[in-house]
């Protein structure tokens, strides 16, 4: 066998360069498209001692108890981003306290977001008329079940939302969402 000198070895041709460029571009796009899919299946990191998720406001900022209480009056129910990114109502119990539970705002009938009607003191679904009392218990269908609950904990002024797995205090039954 004869040795080929370095100057006789042909350089990368245009076709090979274009193949490498195409492969790199397709690989980059595929990885970019797969990232959100893979991220969906990875559970969020636990925060706080209770293992909850940090509550976030409508802009995606962490909710602080002091800021929330300064902007919301007693009896107010306002939305935050809770577990799994679901809209969750934080309840202001008093001038200086956030309730120890939150109410998931997803209607149990068809999944619409249920707004709080302060005048009627209940949640009223705009899609098909289901109604829930101030604690999220269904009072008028077609929704078959009460709204899901979540624990709310305040630690070092940060608000955390965690899974509710105990008995539902509204129905004295096991929670359907756990």
UniProtKB/Swiss-Prot annotation:
CDD domains: Rieske_cytochrome_b6f (cd03471). Its cofactor is [2Fe-2S] cluster. It is found in: Cellular thylakoid membrane. It is a single-pass membrane protein. Keywords: 2Fe-2S, Disulfide bond, Electron transport, Iron, Iron-sulfur, Membrane, Metal-binding, Thylakoid, Translocase, Transmembrane, Transmembrane helix, Transport. One of its GO terms (molecular function) is 2 iron, 2 sulfur cluster binding. The keyword Iron applies. InterPro entries: Cyt_b6_f_Rieske, Rieske_2Fe-2S, Rieske_2Fe-2S_sf, Rieske_Fe-S_prot, Rieske_Fe-S_prot_C. Its main location: membrane. Disulfide bonds join 112-127. It catalyses: 2 oxidized [plastocyanin] + a plastoquinol + 2 H(+)(in) = 2 reduced [plastocyanin] + a plastoquinone + 4 H(+)(out). GO terms for biological process: photosynthesis. Residues 65-161 form the Rieske domain. Gene3D superfamilies: Rieske [2Fe-2S] iron-sulphur domain (2.102.10.10), Single helix bin (1.20.5.700). [2Fe-2S] cluster binds at residues 107, 109, 125, 128. The Rieske iron-sulfur protein is a high potential 2Fe-2S protein. HAMAP family: Cytb6_f_Rieske. Belongs to the Rieske iron-sulfur protein family. Component of the cytochrome b6-f complex, which mediates electron transfer between photosystem II (PSII) and photosystem I (PSI), cyclic electron flow around PSI, and state transitions. This is Cytochrome b6-f complex iron-sulfur subunit. The lineage of its organism: Bacteria, Bacillati, Cyanobacteriota, Cyanophyceae, Synechococcales.
